Amino acid sequence: MKELMNVSTIGFDVAVIGAGPAGISCAASLADIGLEVVILDEQANPGGQIYKNIEKVSDACLKILGEDYKAGKPLVQRFRNSKLTYFSGACVWQVNTDGHIFYSKEGNSHEIAARYIVVATGAMERPVPFPGWTLPGVMGAGGANNLIKNGGVKPSGRVVLAGSGPLLLLEAVHLIEMDVEIGAILETTPAVPNLSSLVNLPKALKRIDLLKKGIVMLHKIRKAGIKHYKGIRNLTAKGNDRVESVHAMKADIPLDIDTDLLLVHFGVIPNTAIFRQLECRHQWNDVQRYWFPQCDKWGRTSLDNVFAAGDGCFVHGAVSAALKGE
């Protein structure tokens, strides 16, 4: 694999944007059949958000992050062994429909061109504004998880987690294993599942492995004696120069919890910035509540030379993203 620092306009068969599981799987597969492939990513190393720093993570952090994170190692190793061009630390800021891509690296702007473009920019945490969300000390649970991956960095002081989704519980488990004090978990998920969610129960039962992972996480949280509230509303972060406490309502009961850090997570959505810049056709998913680019079964968007791979076109998770990249 060639890793270039500076380059003028160069032509490639395919340019892949994003070096997460979908991007590196796609790039490696294309390189295997002899195509000239370039892949660009803003991070210093391949792996995306889900497998961030997988090549350099310590054994102690690897134990905390678990087998799902460890599964990224063979993907990255295959990518490293592929004959392709890799631009790390490259921030793509413009993509044209004619295949020209503009990006910045180390303070300089560059341009490359490709016959086909694969956008594999993955997912992002869903931004949900609430009173006090811009206070210092309020951050995404995914961001906190990345700090663990990057260097085993753990929060100091007391932490409250709020929002919904499995990543919220996963982050809580990671913090428990790092001996971080957790003041409470405030879930917006209803305490009693509504009828619309019960419709999906038969499908859920087909993935007993995932249900088991969820049960194990809940058991660890319960065993640690952490207060876990469900069905909360009116989430508010309070403080002067930084967050000092969290307020929420549980039914008609007010909750006020002192904290040094509030980690929030409300699920993930496709990162569609490049698709929107290219004016690819999008559609709305009424269940997941997000826009995503329309694609055929091969990932081709409404533009003949632009393809989508991974969670950037619909969120299915890292394993599925790698397969879609293939």
Task: Outline where the language-model segments fall.
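Residues forming the flavin
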Residues: 2-326
